A protein has these predicted regions:
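Cyclic nucleotide signaling catalytic output domains
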Residues: 2-14, 20-33
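Sensory-domain cores of signal-transduction modules, predominantly PAS/LOV
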Residues: 7, 18, 47-52, 118
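Short loop/turn elements at sensory-signaling interfaces that couple input to output
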Residues: 13-14, 133-161
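PAS/PAC or PAS-like capping segment
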Residues: 25-26, 95, 153-158
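PAS/LOV and related PAS-like sensory modules
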Residues: 32-56, 159-167
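Conserved hydrophobic beta-strand signature of PAS-family and PAS-like sensory domains
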Residues: 58-62, 128
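PAS and related sensory helical modules
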Residues: 62, 69-90, 97-98, 102
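Per-ARNT-Sim (PAS) sensory domains and their PAS-associated C-terminal
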Residues: 95, 99, 109-136, 142-146
Length: 167
């Protein structure tokens, strides 16, 4: 049974569809990679991200990781949801909102699964933070079409990567 278990995990590391016979040396340290839960990854990933419904009229926020909450000054998800009415568009500065939404949907409409925008993100205290936004649209079995969006603080990027991207 232990040998079959080892072969099964080796196959899982290379995709879902496949089979193989056990052979010596399959017990690798790679097996540990399968043990990361979503919460472990989302809370320790060095990047801010959110997940929201990919719909022009109903852009409901589903999730924001702790890095996003910290960056934008929200105490917790409840405060984020309350102050934004659970809408992605309410994170975008009002005078930029229409242009940013149009840009996202034009990029997606051109057959891309990724979009790239730059805007001012509304923080919990009402101030704004200039951010870079990299979104990806995916089909979720549970929620339908959703966006996974990574955010980077433009000023932090400039400070930490100024040598890599000279002015």
């Amino acid at each position: 049974m232990r040998c079959a278990d080892g072969a099964l995990y080796e196959i899982k590391l290379h995709g879902k569809n496949g089979c193989m016979a056990y052979r010596e040396g399959l017990q690798s340290g790679a097996r540990k990679q399968l043990g990361f839960a979503f919460k472990d990854v989302s809370e320790h990933l060095p990047g801010a991200f959110i997940i929201y419904r990919a719909h022009k009229e109903d852009d409901e926020l589903f999730y924001a990781n702790s890095e996003f909450l910290r960056m934008a000054g929200y105490k917790d998800l409840d405060e984020l949801f309350r102050l934004t009415q659970k809408r992605f568009r309410n994170l975008i500065r009002e005078d930029e909102r229409q242009q940013m939404e149009q840009s996202i949907w034009e990029q997606i409409g051109d057959g891309n699964e990724n979009d790239y925008i730059r805007f001012h993100l509304r923080k919990a205290d009402g101030t704004y933070l200039s951010v870079l936004d990299h979104g990806r649209i995916v089909d979720s079995q549970q929620y339908g079409r959703v966006f996974y969006v990574l955010f980077a603080d433009r000023e932090e990027m400039r400070l930490h990567y100024s040598e890599q991207f000279p002015q």
